[in-house]
Amino acid sequence: MKGVNHYKKYKIQPVEFAQANELNYCESNIIKYAVRHKDKNGIDDVKKIIHYAELLLELEYSDK
């Protein structure tokens, strides 16, 4: 699979990992931003991880 430079150093692309493990949208975005934050957008990507984690909490656990 083709990949952009900030993912090429990994054995598997985040999208391939997400697909193989049937991750939902929030989970796959958390993985994507966690993998790339050091090579691309730094703190902005970490903030996106937090955003998607909070969204995951709301969607999956708000009634518990």
Language model region names:
Residues 1-64:
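Intrinsically disordered, low-complexity regulatory regions
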